[in-house]
Structures are given as C-alpha cells and as structure tokens.
C-alpha cells in the first residue's frame, strides 16, 4: 500500500499527463481536502518530490486565492537534462540532493534501479566518512564525473 505522499505525487504527475502541458497549477487547500490530509503534507511532497533536481520549478502564492504552480523543466533529450543537473550541483551537494538527482535520472529512464542503488552507495555518508564539508564537496565531484558518462552510454 502506498503512503499518502506517494498518492499525492502520483496524482500531481497524472495532472501533468492529462493536461499535456509543462505547467500544473494546484491549490493547497483543494488538494488537502481531496486527500483528507493537512496542507503541510502537500508542502512535504512538493519540497521532496518536485525539486529542481527532479526537473521541476515551483512557484507558490500564499493566501486566499493562493496556488502552487509546478513547471516541468523541459529538456527534450538526455543531454539537456544532464547539463541542467550539472549546472545545479555547484561546488558541493548534500546526500539528500544527490538522491533527488538519482530519482530524477531513474524517472527519466537514464539509469536503471541497479545503477541508482550502486551510485547511492558510492555517495552515501557511510561511504564518505569524513567531515561534512569535505564529504559534500567530494559527493559533488563524483556526480559531476558520473553524469557525463551516463549521458554518453
């Protein structure tokens, strides 16, 4: 059985499919009511599943007529998506951000489940046992070296 976050994520992805557009606009209160959950649950899903690393941009307007606009960053090919990821990595990256990137690569069919798991082990904090700053820098360097290879094959 899926948890509420998975259900909300699938619903939003279905909205993209049905609209055939790269932009979906939702209202926090309506979604919360539809799924009988608190608005913070929706915020969690947006913050963790529709990130820049996953290939989305978020615009949010709070208040009475507030909305959340989710825009797919459209990269028609693998090269465009990988170049986008290389731009957002920066000099360092957290483990969670790295996992988001791997999720995005997996969603787009650029890596297999097995490859994603192997890369997760490589960039995991248990593998990179050192101070946080150095670990995040090394993790970024690993991903910057891997991404062009993923694009090549």
From Swiss-Prot:
The UniProt entry, under Pfam families, shows: CtsR (PF05848), CtsR_C (PF17727)
Ranges in coiled-coil conformation: none
Presence of the UniProt keyword Repressor in the record? yes
In alphabetical order, the GO MF annotations are: DNA binding
Matches recorded under InterPro entries: CtsR, CtsR_C, CtsR_C_sf, CtsR_N, CtsR_N_sf
Q: Which GO terms describe its biological process?
A: regulation of DNA-templated transcription
Is the keyword DNA-binding in the record? yes
| Keyword vocabulary terms for this entry | DNA-binding, Repressor, Stress response, Transcription, Transcription regulation
The similarity annotation says: Belongs to the CtsR family.
Described by its record, this protein's role is as follows: Negative regulator of clpC, clpB and clpP transcription by binding directly and specifically to their promoter region.
Kindly provide the name given to this protein in its UniProt entry: Transcriptional regulator CtsR
Report the gene name. ctsR
